[in-house]
Curated annotation (Swiss-Prot):
InterPro entries, alphabetized: ACR1-12, ACT_dom
PROSITE patterns named among the record's database cross-references: ACT (PS51671)
Keywords: Chloroplast, Plastid, Repeat, Transit peptide
Primary subcellular site in the record, as a coarse category: plastid
Protein name from the UniProt record: ACT domain-containing protein ACR11
Organism encoding this protein: Arabidopsis thaliana (Mouse-ear cress)
ACT domain location: 98-178, 213-283
Induction note: By light.
Amino acid sequence: MAMASASGSALCFTDASSSLALRRDCGALCLPPRTVTFGFVDKPLVNLERLRLSTLKIRASNATAVENGKQEGSAADSDKVPTPVVIIDQDSDPDATVLEVTFGDRLGALLDTMNALKNLGLNVVKANVYLDSSGKHNKFAITRADSGRKVEDPELLEAIRLTVINNLLEFHPESSSQLAMGAAFGVLPPTEPIDVDIATHITIEDDGPDRSLLFIESADRPGLLVELVKIISDISVAVESGEFDTEGLLAKVKFHVSYRNKALIKPLQQVLANSLRYFLRRPSTDESSF
């Protein structure tokens, strides 16, 4: 079982005019934060391991699939490849992170997945299986082995996501060409990479007086969850809850965010959107910019 890891990347403006323009839009709101409120926990911004993610749901799915060179939906393909789905749910259980994996009726007991989770320093405290029209759902409640608590570190949540997807690609390589992760972990990489400029869409709207709703759509890549959290927290915006969907080559994110327990005002919405757009359209960052 190949292991996967994820690491964050800070947002740095190499162009001074870009940084000044963003600060001019929001004034004092753009000052570098001393602490970050993330999932109702105040933590110093020393490194990404200090950030906490208490109410995030991550979903990874393959919108289309290919098996034996035949596209799903082809008349000649009577055995269609099901859609793999990975959900990491922080809402359902206050004491554990809930992991759910579905791939039609093709998955077994997922002993390899449980072993991979143990290699990440996690314990599987409960497991069950249920069936519905979409297939067999393998559900696990997992905690950190060192503390017995649910996983709240964005880097570890991203490592779980990549490990499970890598595990699916290893045992079901037919989906590799349709997943962004296939370029790194699959036997057949995507044939048509996504244009980041075209694929990136960011919108922010009010969701009551105390929080705003942030929607992000962009090209998926390993480590994206951690990187997005870092960018948002860098301008003192707190992520209260959310959902991270990986659909084929795209990442679709929905975050409930707030600034000092209030919805984001328009200037701060613009700064956040500009910061995310600047980062997402620069998929690689020079080490010298850190």
